[in-house]
């Protein structure tokens, strides 16, 4: 996230629009999620004043310290959890976030579903796919993504709307994004959260609906 806030946001939005127009692929619009981890509360204000409303946070505790006060001033903020979630943080996550992008195992799915039932919320959720099958990364195996997503719906009652991935560092991202798009079609999960600062234009070419830029 750049210190020259309005210019940085405008530049990214223009690149997103240009990529979308160039490739002519669905969806109708690509959503920019500004990755705000490590930035303090007041550092967010210029982005909010410049019109940015979608933000991604990696840690529940950090988000708790930052966003409640900002939400009182900017009530239309949409907050996405894009980092790993522990089951003992499910209650806090459901209370604070609007979208959960990192559902990757049954224990988390059940913890989220249980808390949503308790408070009467139904948050949109993404299945996180370990698209490169990397040992150090979270996410379900690509071969299990479709069945896991269906299980999240049928057994846990989650509202699975899409898939999310982070491709391997140093590898051309296009084939991984294409693979995620194919899995999303099979899973009947129309939203695709893929693409970050260095590769979001490639992700848009493959059908990304959400890009995460920080």
Residues of each region from the PLM?
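Conserved alpha/beta-domain cores
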Residues: 1-198, 204-206
């Amino acid at each position: 996230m750049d210190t020259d806030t309005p210019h940085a946001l405008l530049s990214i939005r223009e690149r997103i629009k240009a990529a979308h127009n160039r490739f002519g692929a669905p969806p109708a619009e690509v959503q920019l999620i500004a990755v705000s981890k490590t930035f303090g509360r007041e550092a967010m204000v210029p982005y909010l004043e410049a019109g940015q409303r979608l933000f991604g946070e990696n840690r529940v505790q950090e988000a708790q310290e930052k966003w409640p006060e900002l939400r009182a001033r900017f009530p239309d903020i949409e907050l996405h959890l894009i980092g790993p979630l522990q089951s003992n943080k499910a209650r806090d996550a459901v209370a604070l976030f609007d979208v959960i992008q990192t559902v990757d195992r049954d224990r988390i799915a059940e913890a989220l579903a249980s808390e949503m039932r308790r408070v009467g919320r139904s948050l949109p959720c993404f299945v996180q796919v370990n698209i490169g099958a990397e040992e150090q990364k979270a996410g379900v195996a690509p071969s299990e993504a479709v069945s896991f997503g269906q299980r999240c719906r049928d057994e846990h009652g989650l509202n699975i709307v899409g898939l999310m991935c982070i491709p391997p560092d140093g590898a051309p991202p296009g084939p991984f994004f294409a693979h995620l798009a194919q899995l999303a079609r099979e899973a009947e999960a129309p939203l695709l959260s893929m693409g970050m600062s260095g590769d979001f234009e490639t992700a848009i070419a493959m059908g990304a609906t959400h890009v995460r830029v920080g």
